[in-house]
């Protein structure tokens, strides 16, 4: 109906003229009727071969350590859609995690929009990074979002339902958020990389501390001087982290290399001596490396 749009379509399709044989208002009404028939299951043979796609207008995700927007359902994902991801705890003996649900395209949740939150309690006390919390996002055909968090060890779970009529964004607001994400993409990337570098260092250090104090892992396999070296290196790294909250990505990466240079040779030698094989020199395989809540 809009001449400019017609021209853009023509240019996009290499000069091919758009089909103007259908009244625009009738096209909208027809599409709505077909979609209604498909969703209700009453379309019969006339709609069985017709596919109408609806998509998530903005990325959906949760907040993880450092205020990071961890994405579960990306923008423009065809709905209905379902996605699960396993997360873990950030602190030792942590028995509760807060699931904060956001929509938006930025790397940090402070620049996205909070949709809702809930707590999962009753997690068995364990060292940081041990519990496995499975978070599931499910968007139905009506755009209603169901979020569930389950502790895989105990089976305890909590959930929240977010409907698409409770203050959700207008099309103009959605377009503004997408535009802002594009505008700040490079800046957001640098901030995210810095947070990831800090989290990698922190996770490695705590993993080392847990391993050398766990009898099922390294506690009974290390010589006293070896254990002392690792304890000293990890203690100094944690003190450095406390004193350098705003360090750059390269600083965190350099500090991680320093700690690895002390710990990895000791860990490798212990496993070789015992005839075992370390699950990666950091002591954790990629499959066990989960974002922290």
Curated annotation (Swiss-Prot):
Q: Which GO terms describe its molecular function?
A: ATP binding; ATP-dependent protein folding chaperone
- The UniProt annotation puts the region (Disordered) at 270-293
Q: Where is the composition biased (Acidic residues)?
A: 284-293
**Keywords per UniProt:** ATP-binding, Endoplasmic reticulum, Glycoprotein, Nucleotide-binding
Entry GO CC: endoplasmic reticulum lumen
Looking at the Swiss-Prot or TrEMBL record, what is one Pfam family this protein matches? HSP70
Question: Out of the domains of life, which is the source?
Answer: Eukaryota
Q: Where is this motif: Prevents secretion from ER?
A: 290-293
* Keyword set includes Kinase: no
Q: What does this protein do?
A: Probably plays a role in facilitating the assembly of multimeric protein complexes inside the ER.
Q: Which family does it belong to?
A: Belongs to the heat shock protein 70 family.
- Record-given protein name: Luminal-binding protein 8
